[in-house]
From Swiss-Prot:
Coiled coil region boundaries: none
InterPro entries, per database record: Flagellin (IPR001492), Flagellin_C (IPR046358), Flagellin_C_sub2 (IPR042187), Flagellin_N (IPR001029)
Entry keyword Secreted: yes
Function: Flagellin is the subunit protein which polymerizes to form the filaments of bacterial flagella.
Gene3D superfamilies: 6.10.280.190, f41 fragment of flagellin, C-terminal domain, f41 fragment of flagellin, middle domain, f41 fragment of flagellin, N-terminal domain, Flagellar export chaperone, C-terminal domain
Cellular component terms (Gene Ontology): bacterial-type flagellum; extracellular region
Name of the protein in question: Flagellin
Name of a matching Pfam family: Flagellin_C
Alphabetized UniProt keyword annotations: Bacterial flagellum, Secreted
Family from the record: Belongs to the bacterial flagellin family.
GO molecular function, one term: structural molecule activity
Length: 474
């Protein structure tokens, strides 16, 4: 081996190895102190790019989870206020039922209406004052709200909350038709809200005990529809007609015969003095339990009403009596022929009627109106009955909104669970790329420390070797 002093190759080799072991120690210490395998792009350029993309997703999902939790809070706020709305509507329904009872007089119903009015105002106050982060959520303005529930663009849940203002809930489909036809109602179908049609049995199967309640009457047709038991649908029937009364009697020898629905009201009654409208009314009402017909006076007019929708048939004759001029059955009057009743049909959803609709005097399609529970008036029995249907419609609307809020909360819960699962798996994947392996790095640190100590000792030995050349000079 050549002995030289200008170039100490062994020293250079020892220095290089010492630098390498020092770099190993620095890398190990950096990774152990930071916990990361990748501390800069030079550690793993591709790995850094992948891990940073994963970090963006993970942080995005963290925020998405917070957004979804905010959505749950909002829907809970809305649903809680709707519960109070439901309570108010239930109280209004109780009051309407109370007012519908005939034991109440007009003063009682006025008092009930006063409470109804206060409850209507409370419905609106509740809807207007329910807010989340300054936004009203129940007055109909919270529409197409978008919740960002993903780490990327357009990963959203969009929903709207319908208004529960008193003017916006309680719409019903209702119609009072023209007089029913003189044919039985057959092959009728009815559907509500676009649902499946329900067949209605022929009115021939719902005749009443009186001949005036035959299959052609509004009475039988209403009974047939109500007999189908369609939830949320009600049908009532009333027969009524008003006629200006022609003169009856007033001359010696005049007699008068009046029959209503086959029941004799006057039979060969001598009327040398003209029969007054009051006497006519009282005579008709004296047999109302048999005819089902009540008479009321309005000036010179008389109104006959059958509250159950039975037909009203009037027959008159007598001495000194001129048909078509005298009495009730004057030409073109309602009682010149059999008077048939009208049906009033109401439902909480739109109504579609198929089959022989003309026999009912109703339209084939009846849409919901735009009135709400703010329009109800229970100061009459009829108003109280109508109020019940509107309140039921309002309850259906509110309960539908509440169900939507419950479904939304469940959806947010599932979204959060999915985000947490994806975030967990993505974090594990990022960890495998980015995080330091402490076992390996501790081993590398120990190895570097040993090599550092050995390298330092060997460098000292290598640096002392050129001195052996001095022995040759001695």
């Amino acid at each position: 081996m050549t002995e030289v002093i200008n170039t100490n190759v062994m020293s250079l080799n020892a220095q290089r190895n010492l630098n390498a072991s020092q770099k190993m120690m620095q890398t190990a210490i950096q990774r152990l102190s930071s916990g990361l395998r990748i501390n800069s792009a030079k550690d793993d350029a591709a790995g850094m790019a992948i891990s940073e993309a994963m970090t963006a997703q993970i942080r995005g999902m963290d925020q998405a989870i917070r957004n979804a939790n905010d959505g749950i809070s909002l829907s809970q706020t809305a649903e809680g206020a709707m519960q109070e709305t439901t309570n108010i509507l239930q109280r209004m329904r109780e009051l309407a039922l109370q007012s519908a009872n005939s034991t109440n007089n007009s003063d009682d119903r006025q008092a009930i209406q006063q409470e109804i009015t206060q409850l209507q105002a409370e419905l609106d106050r509740n809807a207007q004052n329910t807010q989340f982060n300054g936004q009203r959520v129940l007055d109909g303005s919270f529409q197409n709200a978008s919740f960002q529930v993903g780490a990327n663009a357009n990963q959203t849940i969009t929903f709207s909350i319908g208004s529960i203002m008193s003017s916006a809930i309680g719409g019903i489909a209702s119609q009072t038709g023209t007089a029913v036809s003189g044919a039985a109602a057959t092959d009728i179908t009815i559907s509500l809200g676009g649902g499946a049609p329900i067949s209605i049995n022929s009115s021939a199967g719902f005749v009443g005990p009186d001949a005036s309640q035959d299959a052609t009457s509004a009475y039988a047709k209403a009974a047939a529809i109500n007999g189908a038991g369609i939830a949320g649908l009600q049908v009532t029937a009333v027969t009524a007609g008003t006629q200006t009364v022609g003169p009856i009697g007033g001359t010696a020898g005049d007699t008068y015969n009046l029959t209503i629905n086959g029941v004799a009201v006057f039979t060969n009654t001598e009327l040398s003095t003209a029969l007054s409208n009051t006497q006519l009314r009282d005579g008709i009402n004296s047999v109302s339990s048999q005819t089902g017909v009540l008479a009321t006076l309005n000036g010179g007019d008389i109104t006959l009403t059958a509250s159950d929708g039975r037909n009203i048939s009037v027959t008159e004759s007598g001495t000194g009596f001129t048909a078509g001029t005298d009495g009730l059955t004057v030409t073109a009057g309602p009682f010149a022929a059999t008077l048939r009743g009208n049906l009033t049909i109401s439902a909480i959803n739109s109504i579609a009627i198929g089959g022989t609709v003309a026999t009912l005097g109703l339209s084939a399609a009846i849409a919901k109106d735009t009135l709400g529970v703010n329009s109800i008036d229970v100061t009459t029995t009829a108003g109280a009955q109508a109020a019940l249907l509107r309140i039921d419609s309002a309850l259906t609307s509110v309960n539908s909104n509440r169900a939507a809020m419950g479904a939304l909360q469940n959806r947010f819960d599932l979204t959060i669970a999915n985000l947490q699962n994806v975030e967990e798996n993505l974090s594990a994947a990022r960890s495998r790329i980015q995080d330091a392996d402490f076992a390996a790095e501790t081993s590398n640190l120990t190895k570097g420390q040993i090599l550092q100590q050995a390298g330092t000792a060997m460098l000292a030995q290598a640096n002392s070797l050129p001195q052996s050349v001095l022995k040759l000079l001695g």
